[in-house]
């Protein structure tokens, strides 16, 4: 009997069929590192599934399946290859759980396994998801990475995602980091005519982090 196929393994992972995933990994442990044509490992595919999206799913949130993959050696921080323009962003399994799966129980599980939350902040901002953003911030991510030249706090200000913007301000994200056009979060907040309370908080945070702006001659 030959080794199980990549197709069978990935299908089991996407179906959250944790028992089949476990059995297939016993038969072919090297499958845990296999990639599909887009560079996804089975862990990425499992994390991208949305709960309730398929009546054939074998469990409610994929945690048993993801546990089986991690216990077999799947890389928690493995990133799917992306365009260089993405900058600091990495499409990790946690990002797939946040952005594609919208699967909060799995997000919490991955964070407990010490997944790096830094790359998922933009996804939380996109949906202005306070619950996910709060969970990510608890793990003390790097708040000042840039994707397409935008930090999460700049992105939140530009998109007018006020709930997550307020959370990033409270967490101490640096509002002075500029985008490729030379604009910082305070500049874009003014351009977007965000509430004065938000503007004041951004000004206060910038002053706290960097001191007063130099006076013009």
Language-model region placement:
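Ankyrin repeat structural motif
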Residues: 17-25, 53-71, 101-111, 129-138, ...
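The conserved C-terminal loop/turn that links adjacent ankyrin repeats
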Residues: 30-33, 73-77, 114-116, 140-144, ...
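Ankyrin repeat A-helix N-terminal signature
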Residues: 11-16, 45-62, 84-103, 123-130, ...
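Short, intrinsically disordered, low-complexity terminal segments
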Residues: 9-10, 39, 69-71, 94, ...
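Ankyrin-repeat-protein effector appendages
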Residues: 1-8, 108-123, 139, 171-174, ...
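N-terminal segments that cap or nucleate solenoid repeat domains
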Residues: 1-45, 132-145
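Structured catalytic/translocation cores of nucleotide/phosphate-coupled proteins
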Residues: 152, 157-171, 175, 179, ...
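Ankyrin-repeat boundary/"N-cap" motif
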Residues: 2-9, 34-52, 79-96, 116-126, ...
């Amino acid at each position: 009997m030959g080794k199980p196929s990549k197709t069978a393994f990935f299908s089991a992972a996407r179906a959250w069929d944790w028992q089949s995933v476990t059995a297939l990994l016993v038969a072919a442990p090297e499958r845990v590192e296999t990639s599909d044509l887009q560079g996804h490992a089975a862990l990425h595919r499992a994390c991208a599934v949305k709960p309730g999206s398929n009546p054939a799913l074998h469990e409610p949130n994929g945690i048993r399946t993801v546990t089986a993959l991690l216990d077999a050696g799947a890389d928690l921080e493995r990133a799917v290859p992306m365009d260089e323009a993405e900058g600091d962003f990495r499409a990790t399994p946690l990002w797939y759980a946040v952005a594609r799966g919208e699967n909060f129980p799995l997000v919490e599980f991955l964070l407990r396994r010490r997944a790096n939350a830094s790359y998922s902040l933009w996804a939380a901002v996109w949906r202005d998801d306070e619950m996910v953003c709060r969970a990510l911030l608890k793990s003390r991510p790097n708040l000042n990475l840039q994707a397409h030249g935008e930090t999460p706090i700049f992105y939140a200000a530009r998109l007018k995602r006020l709930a997550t913007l307020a959370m990033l301000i409270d967490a101490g994200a640096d509002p002075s980091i500029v985008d490729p056009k030379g604009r910082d979060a305070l500049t874009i907040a003014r351009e977007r005519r965000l509430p004065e309370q938000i503007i004041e908080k951004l000004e206060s945070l910038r002053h706290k982090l960097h001191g007063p702006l130099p006076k013009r001659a």
